[in-house]
């Protein structure tokens, strides 16, 4: 679907800067990313809460033993 929007010069500059910084191919890709973020407005807080719950559970030592098995980060 094709959609036309009106944005201020400031908004276009911000969008262009984000597209360039993120290595996205187009303004459309930048807007699509913004819409995906809008779908899950609490996702960042949800991850922060999950991390705090995990940290408070006291499983840090067991996890450190597990990740110390010599396997590094997978290439992305």
Swiss-Prot record:
InterPro entries reported in the protein's UniProt record: CopG
Protein name: Antitoxin MazE9
Gene Ontology molecular function terms on file: toxin sequestering activity
Organism expressing this protein natively: Mycobacterium tuberculosis (strain ATCC 25618 / H37Rv)
Keyword set, alphabetical order: Toxin-antitoxin system
Assembly information from the UniProt record: Forms a complex with cognate toxin MazF9.
Function: Antitoxin component of a type II toxin-antitoxin (TA) system. Upon expression in E.coli and M.smegmatis neutralizes the effect of cognate toxin MazF9.
Signal peptide start-end: none
Biological processes, Gene Ontology terms: detoxification; positive regulation of growth; regulation of DNA-templated transcription
Induction record: Mildy induced (5-fold) when grown in a non-replicating state.
């Amino acid at each position: 679907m094709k959609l036309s929007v009106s944005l201020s010069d400031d908004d276009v500059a911000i969008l262009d800067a984000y597209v360039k910084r993120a290595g996205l191919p187009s303004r459309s890709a930048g807007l699509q990313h913004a819409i995906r973020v809008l779908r899950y407005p609490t996702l960042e807080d949800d991850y922060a809460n999950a991390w705090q719950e995990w940290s408070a559970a006291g499983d840090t030592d067991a996890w450190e033993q597990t990740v110390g098995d010599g396997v590094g980060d997978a290439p992305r």
